[in-house]
Every structure is written in structure tokens, then in C-alpha cells.
């Protein structure tokens, strides 16, 4: 398992739908990259210059929206994860 450091989180991206609303099946090149995912691991938080640690605002299991091209993809076996900085998270979906 991956353990994020600092203010990073690890997410599992939600897959984009295979068909458009009109029913047409989309090819891989026609699909937009999904910018939603579920957090599976959270780092300790951000360390300020004065040594204070700020706790993350998100938790494991949160469904989030993140910036479109943010993060680094990492493959572990057959699964692909995305490592993001907490600042790249735009919202929590409730």
C-alpha cells in the first residue's frame, strides 16, 4: 500500500462513462479525463515555517473533485492511483 507524505493524498479516480448522453459509445481518445475520485490515504498534513503541523481538511473515503491535470499517476499491480497535493483538491462531494 502507498502512504502519502506531508500534505499529499492518494486517490482512486472514478471512471468516466463509456457512452455519451446520446447513447454513442466513446473511444478512449474522445473521453474527457475524470477529475473525481475517492481518497484512499491521507498524509500527516502541511508543515508550516514555524514548525506547526496543519491537519488535512479531507479524510479517507471522501469523494472529491480535483484540478483537471493535477497529480502524479502511480501503478501498483493492476490498479492505478493518483497522488495529489491537498491544494489541488477543489471540493468534497457530499
Curated annotation (Swiss-Prot):
GO biological process: chaperone cofactor-dependent protein refolding
Native species: Staphylococcus epidermidis
UniProt keyword Hydrolase present: no
Complex and partners: Heptamer of 7 subunits arranged in a ring. Interacts with the chaperonin GroEL.
Protein keywords: Chaperone, Cytoplasm, Stress response
NCBIfam families: PRK00364.2-2, PRK00364.2-3, PRK00364.2-4, PRK00364.2-5
InterPro entries: Chaperonin_GroES (IPR020818), Chaperonin_GroES_sf (IPR037124), Chaprnonin_Cpn10_CS (IPR018369), GroES-like_sf (IPR011032)
Protein name: Co-chaperonin GroES
Function text: Together with the chaperonin GroEL, plays an essential role in assisting protein folding. The GroEL-GroES system forms a nano-cage that allows encapsulation of the non-native substrate proteins and provides a physical environment optimized to promote and accelerate protein folding. GroES binds to the apical surface of the GroEL ring, thereby capping the opening of the GroEL channel.
Pfam families with a match to the protein in the record: Cpn10
Tagged with keyword Chaperone: yes
Cell location: Cytoplasm
Family per similarity comment: Belongs to the GroES chaperonin family.
A GO term, aspect molecular function: protein-folding chaperone binding
GO cellular component: cytoplasm
Amino acid at each position: 500500500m502507498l502512504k502519502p507524505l506531508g500534505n499529499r493524498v492518494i486517490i482512486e479516480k472514478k471512471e468516466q462513462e463509456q457512452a455519451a448522453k446520446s447513447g454513442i459509445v466513446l473511444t478512449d481518445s474522445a473521453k474527457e479525463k475524470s477529475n473525481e475520485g475517492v481518497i484512499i490515504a491521507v498524509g500527516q498534513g502541511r508543515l508550516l515555517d514555524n514548525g506547526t503541523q496543519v491537519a488535512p481538511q479531507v479524510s479517507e473515503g471522501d469523494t472529491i473533485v480535483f484540478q483537471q491535470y493535477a497529480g502524479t499517476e502511480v501503478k501498483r499491480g493492476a490498479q492505478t492511483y493518483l497522488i495529489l497535493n491537498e491544494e489541488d483538491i477543489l471540493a468534497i462531494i457530499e
